[in-house]
């Protein structure tokens, strides 16, 4: 089901004045259409939004506010957007969406939703964020994946940027933008040949030309407790013991290694291990 995710325009929802709380941010869908993906474990997880909305975020301290101002020109995020793709592993939010009036779409709107979701599914950000692993963990009831949220926004002033809430990350809240490398056709061909050569040698596995660029971090912070103290994320396990068997082989002294790790589970009802 995860590998076959596709838009379901016949099940689209009409949304207006709908507010989604994701970590410290507010995502307001003022007016538009929300097209769900085909379901995973009985419910959709990824959504395409087309319409008018805005995302609001106040950084938790002066350092993060200064970082945000460096990239956006403001110490607070108040960014309108017309299009977005969401990954929502928040059951209460998905249930609230399901109670909205349905508004099936076809024609150009359906084509736009399909193009947006396909671009997101094929893009590097989804792979970097390990979205498929988070969707799988949520589908099997892993408590750490239940609060995962990702929004890929097309801001009216800031262009395309990401906002992520990942309970498994050390700093669970990330806001930023991937700036692709500006390559000429010649440089792109050269980069592709270099990557392919390295991959034949077992290096740079999984890297694509589209991955080349820089990630600009606008805000990166942990959840804040009621007394304003930072609370770091958890992957649900902690290593107790490592065993490493390593050897250098051949004239090129290639390193071969086997690693065994003993893990201690620190979260109840953990279903998956991302280590």
Language model: regions and residue ranges:
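N-terminal, polar/Ser/Thr-rich
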Residues: 1-256
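Surface-exposed beta-strand/loop patches in extracellular or lumenal glycoproteins
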Residues: 260-275
